[in-house]
Amino acid sequence: MRWTLKPKPSEDKIKHLAQALNVEDFVATLLIQRGIETFDDAKNFFRPSLEHLHDPFLMKDMDKAVARIELAIENHENILVFGDYDVDGTTAVSLVSAYLKSHYPNIATYIPDRYDEGYGISFKGIDFADDNGFSLIIALDCGIKSIDHIAYAKEKNIDFIICDHHRPGNILPDAVAILDPKREDCDYPYDELCGCGVGFKLIQALGKNRNETIEDLVPYLDLVATAIAADIVPITGENRVLAYFGLQVINSDPRPGIKALVHQVKKKVLDITDVVFIISPRINAAGRIKHGNHAVELLTEFNFEQAQQFASEIEQYNSDRKDLDKRITKEAFQQILENQEEERFSTVVFQEDWHKGVIGIVASRLIETYYRPTLVFTKSGDKYAASARSVKGFDVYNALDACAEHLEQFGGHMYAAGMTLKAENYLLFKEAFEKCVKETIQPEMRTPEIEIDAEINFSDITPKLIRILKQFEPFGPQNMTPVFMTTNVKDTGYAKTLGADEEHLRLFVKQNNSEGIAAIGFGLGKKIDITKNQNTFQLAYSLAENEWNGNVSTQLMLKDIRTNEK
C-alpha cells in the first residue's frame, strides 16, 4: 500500500479562502483540492440548490426529443420506455415511464433479459415493439453505439430517442434524437451525468414545456440519487445537487419501492454509502439473478404492501447473488493459482458455468487481492462474455479497443466495461490483453494507493471540524471522504484484534499529550505488532461519529497503519 499526500495548493489561495470562510487552513486546503476556490464556490458547494441545475434544452437534440414525444402524445401513439437491466437502467426506466404515465396512458416498459438478449438495445426488444404497435422507443442508459439496431427499427417505422451517457463511437445511430452529454458536438455544461440523470433532464425539459416547476420533479430524485450512487459517477456539479436532494427524498418521503427496501434493512437515516451498499445491490440483484423487470415493478409500485412483497422477493435474489459471488470468487482464485498466474500484469479467467450476473462483482473481488486490470469470462450462448474492472489510472476501455480485433463487441468506461468474443478467440485475446497491459500500465498503478488529503494533528479534530466535514456530504468520486494522516501516534495499551480470524484491529490512540481517541481498522489485524512496545506509528484515516448507548463520540476509521520511520 502506498501513501500519496495530495499536492498542497499555494499558500495565498489557502489563506484567502480560509479568511473568507473563517475556517482553518487545512479545511480550506480540502476545499481547494475539490475545485472550491472562492466564497461563491463554497456557498454553492455547502448549500446545493435546485436553481443550480442547468437548462435541459442546452443538451444537443433535447428540443427534437421533446417535440417527438409531444407529437406521439398528440397522435395517441404507443411509447415504449427501454432500458438496461442494471441500477442506472432500471431507475431511469422507472423515472421516465412514471413521469410519462402521469400525463399519458399509452406507456409501457421493456428491460432486456440479461442472458437471452444481453446488454443494451436488442433486436428482440425491437420486434416486441413492432408486434405490439409501438412507434416510438425511448432508450435509457444504452443505445449510443446501437447503429444496426436503430437502422433495423427504422425499417419497421419505429423511431428512437436515445438517452445515454456512455462514450459515443465515430458514427452515431440514425435516431430522431440522441441525448448524450459526452457527444463531441454537445455543449451541455456538465458531461458526468449517469443514464438516469440524462433521463431526468428529459423529464425536466418535458416539464418545462408544460410550465411545471423543478420542485414538481423533486419526488423523482430518489431514483436519480440511487443511480448516481450505483454508477459511481463524480459527485460534482449537477450530480451533487441531484444526489443531495435525492437523499433528502430517500430519508423523508421515498417512493414505496425504495421505502420497502430500506424497511428490509431497518436503517433510519441513509447516506450515499448506504445507498451504494444497501439499496443498489438489491435493485441490481433482480437483473443479475432473475430479470430487471422485477426492479422496475418495485420502483414504480404505488401500494406499499405490494412493494413490500416485491422487496421481499428481491431480498431473496440478493441472498442468492451473495452465495454465487462467494463460490465463483473462490473458483477464480483457484484458477489463478493452478495456472500460476499470480505475477501477471492482468487477470483474465474463464469458466463456462459461472453466473453472468455476478462476474462483474467477482472481478472487483479479485482486484482486492491481485491489484491489476481484471476480466472475468463466462459462456453466453455460443460466445464468451466478460465483465472488466480496472485499477486507478488504467483505462481498461482503451486497452479493450487495442485488442478489438479479437472481440465481437465491447463497451463501457475507463474503469468498467463489458465484452463478448468467439470461443476460439479467447486465448488469443487473453495474451493480447496481457501484452497491452504490460506495455502501457505505469509501475505505480500496480500498487493500491491511499490518497491523503492533509496531514493533521489530533488537536485539530474538533466538534467544529466534524460539523464542517458533514457538510461535505454527499461523498463520492471527486469528493471522496477526506483522508487524513497523523504521525507520532501511540497506542494507549488497549490494542486488540477483532473478528473470528482476528482480521480487524481496534486501538485507542494518543498523539503527544492529546486526549485518547478510538480507532477501528477493518482488515488491519495483521498490523497489530506495529502498535506494540510503545512504538510510535503513522495512521491514515477518515473521521466518523460512533453512537453507543445514546453517546456520540469521534472515531478514526483506519485506512492503513505504518511505522513512523516511513
Q: Can you name each region flagged by the protein language model?
A:
Residues 95, 171-212, 217-229:
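Short alpha-helices
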Residues 125, 149-152, 198-202, 242-245, ...:
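Alpha-helical scaffold elements adjacent to nucleotide-binding pockets in ATP/GTP-utilizing enzyme cores
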Residues 165-166, 355, 413, 504:
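Histidine-centered active-site/metal-ligand motif
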Residues 106-108, 159, 177, 518:
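Conserved beta-strand segments of alpha/beta enzyme cores
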